Amino acid sequence: PMTKVLNAADISKALNAFEAPGSFDHKKFFQLVGLKGKTHEQVKKVFNIL
């Protein structure tokens, strides 16, 4: 599951930040969800899950 790599609270925070249609910002999303601080392998694992 995604929560083995990312914090569940961070995932919720990121999803809530972009609820409005057209508000998605991938750079901000990656920052909020905690991907910016992850290793290449951890990021790869997240995208494999998606």
From Swiss-Prot:
<keyword id="KW-0479">Metal-binding</keyword>
<dbReference type="InterPro" id="IPR008080">
    <property type="entry name" value="Parvalbumin"/>
</dbReference>
<dbReference type="GO" id="GO:0005737">
    <property type="term" value="C:cytoplasm"/>
</dbReference>
<comment type="function">
    <text>Probably regulates the activity of the caudal neurosecretory system. Binds two calcium ions.</text>
</comment>
<dbReference type="GO" id="GO:0005509">
    <property type="term" value="F:calcium ion binding"/>
</dbReference>
<protein>
    <recommendedName>
        <fullName>Parvalbumin</fullName>
    </recommendedName>
</protein>
<keyword id="KW-0106">Calcium</keyword>
<feature type="domain" description="EF-hand">
    <location>
        <begin position="38"/>
        <end position="50"/>
    </location>
</feature>
<keyword id="KW-0514">Muscle protein</keyword>
<comment type="similarity">
    <text>Belongs to the parvalbumin family.</text>
</comment>
<keyword id="KW-0677">Repeat</keyword>
